[in-house]
């Protein structure tokens, strides 16, 4: 059994021992919220109605049938004003510590993905807003790499936009976004066959048994690869034993591959379809020659190095007088100057290393488990624990709601695994052990 009295230590600084009116037991408050998330109950009000008549709920809370339960508003107020994000994070970590203490946590191979949660906001109530484009977290590191690459090719350093003091500074680059007037923290989500809506995105990491190790909630219009940095940093901080990071094609970017490899770990990523125009020559027919630092086109012509741009892409260009008479020019380029340009990122070598991992036994064995791990976590959360949409508004409230839901799912999985272990020990005490059955139950 899980010792819930540890919650007293986590909330000790929020209560006064020597004065004031006796408060509701914080353990009972957390147990009621865990009941709500375990059974996918839509609200705290409905949870309290069920707890009034449910004997199992009362036994779990430590109440008899004649005792009155806390009012639902007391629980709501406590989680809105008293139990901060740090307290909820501590409860989430404490449950994971219980899982690790029981021997069920295996963070050597982890699985990363994101799922959208519909926000409590009407898509029709929106406004257009101009916001500054956020700088990339790795921009300084990329700029240093670009300058080193340009110097190696004999190119001048790129002129910084704010170097010239005589000219007014360039205004920050702006972008137009759609903002909800009901819940400004949410973002517009539209992907594949999903209906366009305001949503949040839960970027989540789990292990091979489906225990959620880390989660980060962002607006629905934030790309998975953008939120990966925060998730990965916190994951490595709490679980340095991580060795393989498995993700889908949305995470296959030069920076993510470099970040994982430089940390001494291995990315397990799938094949990513090329984003080329339909009917044009496939990308793999343009071969990079590392020795001569050039690109060979399908007609065995050389595309020489031209420059390295601000995005970190090396540009290789063909000779226009050669391309004019090329028999496949219509399928190669539509440039009016008859010049073909092929780009290659300065960190593209990390992508090629990730491709080698994809064909290795460890890459094949880990990626095939995605459907049984992280995808199963999202399916269970939405179908069994009511995470398809959130009744809360604001990034802080939704983050706390998601973490409590994943904490309840981890607790449920821990109870199932402990029951299977108890069942196995009872089975082995009466019957000759079956090795395969024992391995499956454990």
Locate the predicted segments by residue.
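Short arginine-rich
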Residues: 58-62
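Anion-binding and metal-coordination hotspots
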Residues: 40-53, 65-442
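Basic, short loop/linker segments at the boundary and entry of helix-turn-helix/winged-helix-like folds
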Residues: 1-34, 39-40, 346, 350
């Amino acid at each position: 059994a899980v010792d819930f009295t540890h919650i007293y230590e986590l909330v000790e600084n929020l209560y006064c021992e020597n004065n004031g009116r006796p408060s509701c037991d914080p353990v009972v408050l957390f147990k009621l919220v865990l009941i709500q998330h375990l059974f996918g109950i839509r609200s705290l009000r409905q949870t309290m109605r069920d707890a009034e008549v449910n004997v199992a709920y009362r036994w779990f809370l430590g109440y008899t049938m004649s005792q009155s339960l806390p009012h639902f508003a007391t629980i709501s107020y406590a989680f809105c004003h008293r139990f901060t994000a740090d307290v909820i994070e501590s409860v989430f970590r404490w449950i994971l510590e219980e899982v690790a203490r029981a021997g069920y946590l295996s963070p050597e191979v982890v699985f990363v993905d994101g799922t959208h949660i519909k926000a409590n906001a009407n898509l029709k109530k929106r406004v257009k807003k101009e916001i500054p484009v956020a700088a990339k977290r790795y921009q300084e590191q990329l700029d240093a790499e670009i300058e080193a690459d340009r110097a190696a090719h004999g190119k001048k350093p790129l002129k910084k936009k704010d170097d010239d003091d005589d000219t007014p500074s360039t205004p920050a680059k702006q972008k137009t976004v759609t903002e909800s007037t009901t819940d400004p923290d949410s973002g517009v989500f539209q992907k594949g066959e999903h209906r366009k809506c305001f949503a949040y995105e839960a970027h989540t990491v789990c292990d091979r048994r489906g225990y959620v190790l880390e989660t980060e909630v962002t607006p629905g219009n934030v790309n998975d690869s953008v939120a990966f940095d925060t998730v990965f940093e916190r994951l490595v901080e709490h679980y340095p034993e991580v060795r393989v990071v498995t993700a889908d094609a949305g995470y296959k970017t030069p920076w993510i591959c470099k970040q994982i490899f430089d940390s001494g770990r291995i990315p397990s990523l799938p094949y990513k379809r090329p984003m080329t125009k339909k009917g044009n020559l496939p990308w793999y027919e343009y071969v990079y020659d590392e020795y001569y630092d050039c690109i060979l086109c399908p007609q065995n012509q050389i595309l020489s190095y031209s420059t390295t741009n601000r995005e970190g892409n090396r540009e290789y260009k063909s000779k226009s007088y050669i391309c004019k008479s090329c028999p496949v020019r219509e399928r190669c380029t539509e440039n009016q100057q008859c010049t073909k340009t092929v780009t290659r990122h300065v960190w593209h070598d990390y992508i090629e290393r990730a491709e080698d991992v994809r064909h290795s036994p460890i890459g094949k064995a880990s990626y095939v488990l995605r459907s049984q791990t992280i995808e199963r976590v999202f399916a269970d959360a939405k179908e069994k624990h009511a995470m398809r949409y959130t009744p809360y508004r604001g990034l802080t409230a939704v983050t706390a709601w998601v973490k409590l839901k994943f904490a309840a799912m981890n607790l449920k999985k821990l109870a199932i695994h402990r029951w299977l272990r108890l069942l196995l020990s009872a089975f082995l005490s009466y019957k000759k052990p079956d090795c395969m059955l024992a391995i499956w139950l454990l």
